[in-house]
């Protein structure tokens, strides 16, 4: 889709116009583990106080129905008010080791969105420059979100030990999450954890990286960006972390904003792709969600693509970034833009993001959850939607994979196909996305890429978003799955649906 960009940075709201920088504060590990349901299913979300105590017995939702808008019962802490969270050690194979900057990086100037009447209010205008030591304030002058930094599990490449002038400090390495009991049966490691860490992206941090040299190359080639291969090589073959350092070096050396200069030379899909590449990954997710809900209409598939596929640590950082940059509670926006079981699924997923994701699997709990799902669907007349919501929205991805395997043993049916028979619409798509990411995440993005290029026309925003966000995570596996499923390489599909500099950049990012 197309966005109407104001002058300067193309429509991407700048950080509130304060001068101080936003270094990550000392982080603390957030207690890890999943919610261990008590006998009878276990309530969800956590009990009063916002802690990680095992929830009491009883089903979800509570007897009085789902919680009213404004938050979960029992004192669930608000997202933005929490301290900074350290990324869980090891993550799920989502990117490079710690070293990525916080999402507050230099270069995003220009006024904020001009929201249509009746839509979202525009974020605070004004960009930000190379940050000195201090802290960015949140919208409206509130103190900055303490300790928020880009998690290692979503880092797009690791930076070197040195820092350019004006560069953001490196991320504090995440602490290993403390163990949380997973239920009555001993937790057992799962092969899924190893499979997740085996994924790889097409872009890796460039060796012998020189941010100032790259900034000079971009400045010299600015006029011929659409035809000169040098700037394409620089942008498409640097990690996200390295691109942030290039922006800082450009501003330090020339006193100009790289993004504004690029925008003056670019337009259309090339512009959208370049801006996406230069956005820090957490900010890009938050920005995409904001655009999916602002103004008239809602892009539900964007909500599904991001919220149903990200890890817990990624979700909580997206929630905090959304609040910091747009001055809005993402939960309130979701409640106002969605409804019914789809709304409850998304809200439950965000609640799951409060805790660190465990890589252990409780096999006894998986069997119990499989029985619960069978009794909620195939084993009764009608469908108990709340039971599906409880299991699929609150369990970790490794645990859900074990649930799917247990379900197949119990019913001799595939849980994905059962969801297709029991649900329809966006709730079906959302539940399937969660489960597919638990079983094999690259397959979900493979199918999304195929749909973005299927038929007449191309969904360029989806194509750009997936290629960019998965380029340092699992795009290699997505490409392999694509050719196996469709007997056509992803590069061939991109080549037949795009052209010019836009095509060359997409192919370069995808490792062609």
Swiss-Prot record:
Keyword Calcium: yes
Annotated GO MF terms: calcium ion binding; calcium-dependent phospholipid binding; phosphatidylserine binding
Regions of compositional bias (Low complexity) in chain numbering: 14-38, 164-182
Superkingdom field: Eukaryota
PROSITE patterns assigned: ANNEXIN_1, ANNEXIN_2
Family matches, as SUPFAM superfamilies: Annexin
Biased composition (Gly residues): 39-52
SMART domains found in the cross-reference section: ANX (SM00335)
GO cellular component, as recorded: cytoplasm; nucleus; plasma membrane; vesicle membrane
Region ranges (Disordered): 14-62, 146-190
InterPro entries in UniProt: Annexin, Annexin_repeat, Annexin_repeat_CS, Annexin_sf
Keyword Glycoprotein: no
Keywords: Annexin, Calcium, Calcium/phospholipid-binding, Repeat
UniProt repeat feature Annexin, residue ranges: 209-279, 280-351, 364-436, 440-511
Functional summary from the UniProt entry: Calcium/phospholipid-binding protein which promotes membrane fusion and is involved in exocytosis.
Family: Belongs to the annexin family.
Domain notes: A pair of annexin repeats may form one binding site for calcium and phospholipid.
Entry protein name: Annexin A7
Organism listed in the record: Xenopus laevis
